């Protein structure tokens, strides 16, 4: 029986406090930034980039002048031809156009200067809004990341019951503990989304919707009331399955040796849950992630998010199992169990990469403007995290976990697991940040504080749940097979 240690409690509470203080500090700091501060910042950036660009562009501009002049002369000739034809067809307007030209020559400079000033003001306001968005987005990314770990584990747990897998029952208590975080974690994600409003979901701004016909066409789905209702339906369904599955699992431990009624109940509700899950997970990914870019959509997106949460969840199962085994609390877990967990980490990492490439390749080569813009933004403004996550989520685990022997080495699995989790945090970061903060991204105090806050909360809830039941589900009819499992 695991006992929640004081050291872990202190560590978790410290993470929560430090994370809360750091995030609140970054939130208040960002909201003290004024439009004047942003204008000064943009002027400094423009001066810095302008000086750097002048030297690099001189030679390029000289080479382009000839072709530019030719094109310009052709344009003037074309304009003159159109103007002369227009004068011939409408001689009565010629004088009027000449008069307008003289008026424009005296006022054109003033109008251009007013338009330029207006554009600068609009850009500064846009940047200010992005900077205000950053604490909200950082909190949302961290909240969603830890929630999706729990949801991924719940799916894996349901699959084990529905498949009547014989190797995994020794890991069920770890899975049940991780899924205990799902209810509070999912409610927090939904609450942040509703509270942040248009700081994360631009379609929650009525003024934007009023001027955007595409979002208006989706308003039957993308509206705040139904967003909240759907979210509560998702969370209720997931939580009910988790509650009854845990209840039947514990009841099976108290049942007579040949009484498997609770196990059969778990089998039935797990099969039903997986049907519910595959639909609601897709709709959740549309609502909670894809709708931050309301003009963009991908039919693969639900599967893509599923792969990310699935491999992240399995990785956390492996890390907690290794920790408890090192403490001498799970001696019934052997190298073959770790080997199978590492196989899933390896296999789902490859599956995630397949989905990433399929989605990217189809959209990129189709080159449809409203679709390809999603990736253009990320390649231009998020080049390092966008391509860096491929190394973290595919290349590194592929190379480290390819060898069968390495899948049995705990520290190898831990090393690969930490990299995989960091990589999938970056994946969620890449999905949320471009639409909310644009090119004003950075992994700093808001992001690190939010991760610390939810990491502390996750550890506290998960290990509290671990302490509430024996680590070995002795009543499971496959427990002997699981204990003797050897690959």
Outline where the language-model segments fall.
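Hydrophobic secretory-pathway targeting helix
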Residues: 1, 5-32
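Juxtamembrane membrane-water interface segments of multi-pass membrane proteins
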Residues: 1-4, 27-29, 156-177, 195-205, ...
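Long, contiguous internal "core" modules enriched in hydrophobic/ aromatic residues
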Residues: 20, 73, 89, 98, ...
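Aromatic-anchored segments of alpha-helical transmembrane domains
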Residues: 20, 279-283, 418-429
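Low-complexity, proline/glycine-enriched hydrophobic segments characteristic of transmembrane helices
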Residues: 24-135
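Transmembrane-helix bundle segments that line or gate the permeation/cavity pathway
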Residues: 26-41, 143-254, 273
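Hydrophobic cores of alpha-helical transmembrane segments in multi-pass inner/ER membrane proteins
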Residues: 150-155, 187-188, 231-243, 307-322, ...
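Membrane-interface transmembrane-helix boundary segments in multi-pass integral membrane proteins
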Residues: 299-305, 370-390, 438-462
């Amino acid at each position: 029986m695991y006992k929640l240690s004081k050291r872990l409690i202190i560590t978790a509470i410290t993470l929560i406090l430090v994370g809360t203080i750091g995030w609140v500090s970054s939130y208040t700091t960002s909201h003290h930034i004024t439009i004047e501060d942003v204008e000064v910042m943009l002027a400094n950036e423009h001066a810095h980039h302008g000086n750097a660009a002048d030297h690099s562009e001189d030679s390029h501009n000289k080479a382009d002048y000839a072709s530019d002049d030719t094109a310009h002369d052709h344009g003037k000739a074309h304009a003159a031809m159109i103007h002369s034809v227009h004068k011939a067809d409408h001689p009565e307007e010629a004088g009027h156009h000449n008069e307008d030209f003289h008026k424009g020559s005296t006022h054109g400079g003033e109008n251009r200067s007013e338009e330029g000033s207006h554009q600068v003001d609009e850009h500064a306001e846009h940047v200010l809004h992005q900077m205000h968005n950053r604490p909200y987005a950082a909190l949302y990314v961290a909240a969603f990341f830890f929630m999706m770990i729990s949801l991924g584990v719940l799916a894996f747990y349901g699959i084990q019951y529905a498949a009547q897998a014989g190797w995994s029952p020794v890991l069920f208590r770890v899975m049940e503990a991780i899924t205990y975080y799902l209810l509070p974690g999912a409610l927090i994600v939904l609450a942040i989304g509703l509270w942040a409003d248009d700081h994360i979901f631009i379609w929650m701004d009525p003024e934007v919707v009023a001027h955007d016909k595409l979002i208006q066409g989706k308003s039957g789905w993308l509206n705040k009331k139904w967003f909240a209702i759907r979210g509560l339906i998702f969370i209720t369904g997931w939580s009910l399955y988790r509650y009854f599955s845990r209840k039947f699992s514990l009841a099976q431990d108290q049942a007579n040796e040949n009484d498997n009624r609770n196990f059969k109940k778990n089998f039935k509700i797990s099969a039903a849950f997986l049907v519910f899950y595959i639909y609601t997970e897709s709709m959740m990914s549309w609502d909670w992630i894809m709708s931050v870019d309301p003009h963009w959509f991908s039919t693969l997106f639900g599967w893509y998010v599923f792969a990310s949460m699935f491999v992240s969840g399995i990785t956390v199962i492996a890390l907690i199992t290794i920790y408890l085994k090192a403490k001498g609390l799970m001696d019934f877990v052997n190298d073959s169990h770790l080997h199978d967990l590492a196989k899933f980490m390896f296999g789902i990492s490859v599956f995630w990469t397949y989905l990433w490439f399929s989605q990217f390749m189809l959209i990129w080569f189709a080159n449809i403007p409203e679709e390809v813009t999603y990736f253009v933004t990320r390649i231009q403004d998020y080049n390092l995290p966008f391509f860096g996550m491929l190394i973290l989520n595919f290349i590194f685990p592929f190379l480290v976990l390819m060898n069968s022997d390495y899948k049995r080495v705990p520290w190898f699995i831990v090393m690969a697991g930490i990299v995989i989790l960091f990589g999938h945090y970056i994946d969620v970061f890449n999905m949320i940040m471009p639409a909310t903060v644009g090119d004003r991204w950075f992994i700093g105090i808001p992001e690190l504080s939010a991760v610390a806050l939810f990491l502390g909360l996750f550890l506290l809830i998960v290990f509290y749940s671990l302490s509430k039941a024996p680590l070995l589900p002795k009543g499971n009819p496959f427990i002997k097979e699981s204990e003797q499992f050897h690959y």
